[in-house]
Amino acid sequence: MQPDLALAPEAVLDAAGFQALVGATDAQIEDLTRFQTLLAEWNEVMNLVGPLTIATYWTRHALDSAQLIPLAPEATAWADLGAGAGLPGVVLAILLKGRAGAKVHLVESMIKRCRFLEVVAKDLDLPVQIHNARAEDLKLKVDIVTARACAPMTKLLGFAEPYLRNGAVGLFLKGQDVETELSEARKAWTFESELRTSQSDPRGRIVQVKRLSRVR
């Protein structure tokens, strides 16, 4: 999968299209399909994702999450902040399963969403650790910290500060208003950032963040 290759806005993948684009194995597709089923079932009793997005799962959720791995191909330790729906964390764990030393920390403050993550992790035998905690209260040593639909950049950087200060690089999935969010965030934070176009939606962006510190 090429990091800068984006789909057309109207493109919708199925499992075969996702597999061809990402290079996923048959076993990974089986796990991702099972995750789609669990996500749909649990979404009926708790608000995990927009219900209409289940139909576009392979693009909106699977590809949106999977596109992060080529941006950090050597990373084995990941933290997903606000991981309640398992996106991107569960998808990353499925694709990293079997890699030596791989672990994805799923950080979620809502206990009922942690229960969902526990069911998924057990069902799919994933290399994850689930933390029922506030992201900013943990001190985890990871290579990459990520989040999707978690908070505006100013607040998100506050959540991610302990990880970024401990050597992690941030890879955050954001929407088309990210440049406004970044401008606002620079009033409170100093950091290096790089934007990439999302492969799953050319209107979306992936924000890479390094060297974070508070504005003095």
UniProtKB/Swiss-Prot annotation:
Its EC number is 2.1.1.170. Keywords: Cytoplasm, Methyltransferase, rRNA processing, S-adenosyl-L-methionine, Transferase. It is an enzyme of class 2 (transferase). S-adenosyl-L-methionine binds at residues 82, 87, 135-136, 148. SUPFAM superfamilies: S-adenosyl-L-methionine-dependent methyltransferases. Signal peptide: none annotated. The keyword Amino-acid biosynthesis does not apply. Its main location: cytoplasm. It is found in: Cytoplasm. It comes from Caulobacter vibrioides (strain NA1000 / CB15N) (Caulobacter crescentus). Belongs to the methyltransferase superfamily. RNA methyltransferase RsmG family. PANTHER family: S-ADENOSYL-L-METHIONINE-DEPENDENT METHYLTRANSFERASES SUPERFAMILY PROTEIN. It holds the Pfam family GidB. One of its GO terms (molecular function) is rRNA (guanine-N7-)-methyltransferase activity. This is Ribosomal RNA small subunit methyltransferase G. The gene is rsmG. It catalyses: guanosine(527) in 16S rRNA + S-adenosyl-L-methionine = N(7)-methylguanosine(527) in 16S rRNA + S-adenosyl-L-homocysteine. GO terms for cellular component: cytosol. Specifically methylates the N7 position of guanine in position 527 of 16S rRNA.
